[in-house]
């Protein structure tokens, strides 16, 4: 399968490149970066033995290289437009960029179905994180009092994380609506109680040294339950990325969430 990587100079994109190179059934055919200085990836010392073109224009790459799939790990402000461009060129997409609205996901799904091509957008590609979300969804049925704390490196641009939003969406499907906190509570500092989604509070932490972490804290009379997942290294996401690339061959629609392709 011929794979191109968009955002290859980012931390996740860099790890994706190394993963594609390790997989025998996947071939790295192009990489993309915003205003690249290089014309070929071999100009980067780490990849000096390779011969893979570097592009700065997504449409140009799609038309010249015609990859089977593009893996996109860029930034929220271009994630939607990149994915739309990829799908409109009838190319499969695996997207780890976050910040999509429900309306954007719906539109992209319609494009994928009209082209009969597979695509996947996932807030998190770590299998452990997917299990964490599923466990939280099940627990929310019995513990409606819940708050989410997500912790990431301080270069992350969006808050809350896509994983936190997806977790809240999944819990809302099983959870009785409860507006978390006292009815007359007052924030002495604006934002102290975090963001709100369907009555649940979501808190975002950004610190150097972190990668990606989340805990879902449930409370009830006389007891508490905490479900936590930690990614200490970006390698934790790569098995999910490789699985998703292969899975797009079997799909004729866009799937949102890695949990929807796991057996």
Swiss-Prot record:
Enzyme Commission no: 1.17.1.8
Single GO molecular function: NAD binding
Keyword annotations: Amino-acid biosynthesis, Cytoplasm, Diaminopimelate biosynthesis, Lysine biosynthesis, NAD, NADP, Oxidoreductase
SUPFAM superfamilies: Glyceraldehyde-3-phosphate dehydrogenase-like, C-terminal domain, NAD(P)-binding Rossmann-fold domains
EC top class named in words: oxidoreductase
Pathway connected to this protein: Amino-acid biosynthesis; L-lysine biosynthesis via DAP pathway; (S)-tetrahydrodipicolinate from L-aspartate: step 4/4
Record's subcellular location: Cytoplasm
Binding site for (S)-2,3,4,5-tetrahydrodipicolinate: 153, 162-163
Binding site for NAD(+): 7-12, 96-98, 122-125
GO annotation, biological process: diaminopimelate biosynthetic process; lysine biosynthetic process via diaminopimelate
Catalytic activity, as annotated: (S)-2,3,4,5-tetrahydrodipicolinate + NAD(+) + H2O = (2S,4S)-4-hydroxy-2,3,4,5-tetrahydrodipicolinate + NADH + H(+); (S)-2,3,4,5-tetrahydrodipicolinate + NADP(+) + H2O = (2S,4S)-4-hydroxy-2,3,4,5-tetrahydrodipicolinate + NADPH + H(+)
GO CC annotations, alphabetized: cytosol
Keyword Secreted: no
Family membership: Belongs to the DapB family.
Matches recorded under HAMAP family: DapB
NCBIfam families on file: dapB
Function (record text): Catalyzes the conversion of 4-hydroxy-tetrahydrodipicolinate (HTPA) to tetrahydrodipicolinate.
Protein name as catalogued: 4-hydroxy-tetrahydrodipicolinate reductase
């Amino acid at each position: 399968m011929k794979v191109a990587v968009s955002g290859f100079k980012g931390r996740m994109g860099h790890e994706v490149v190394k993963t594609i190179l390790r997989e025998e059934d996947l071939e790295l055919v192009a990489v993309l970066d915003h205003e690249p200085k290089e014309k070929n990836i071999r100009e980067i010392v780490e990849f000096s033995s390779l011969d893979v073109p570097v592009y700065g224009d997504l449409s140009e790459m799609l038309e010249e290289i015609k990859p089977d799939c593009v893996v996109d790990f860029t930034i929220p402000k271009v994630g939607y437009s990149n994915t739309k461009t990829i799908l409109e060129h009838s190319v499969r997409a695996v997207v780890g960029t976050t910040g999509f609205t429900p309306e954007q996901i719906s539109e992209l799904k319609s494009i994928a179905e009209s082209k009969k091509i597979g695509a996947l957008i996932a807030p998190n590609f770590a299998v452990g994180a997917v299990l964490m979300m599923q466990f939280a969804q099940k627990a929310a049925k019995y513990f409606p009092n819940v708050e989410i704390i997500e912790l990431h490196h301080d270069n992350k641009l969006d808050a809350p994380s896509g994983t936190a939003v997806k977790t809240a969406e999944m819990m809302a499907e099983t959870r009785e609506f409860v507006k978390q906190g006292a009815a007359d509570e007052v924030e002495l500092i604006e934002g102290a109680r975090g963001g709100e989604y369907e009555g649940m509070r979501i808190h975002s932490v950004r610190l150097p040294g972190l990668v990606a972490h989340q805990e879902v804290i449930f409370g009830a009379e006389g007891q508490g339950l905490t479900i936590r997942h930690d990614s200490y290294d970006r390698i934790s996401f790569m098995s999910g990325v490789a699985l998703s690339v292969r899975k797009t061959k079997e799909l004729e629609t866009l799937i949102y969430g890695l949990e929807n392709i796991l057996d």
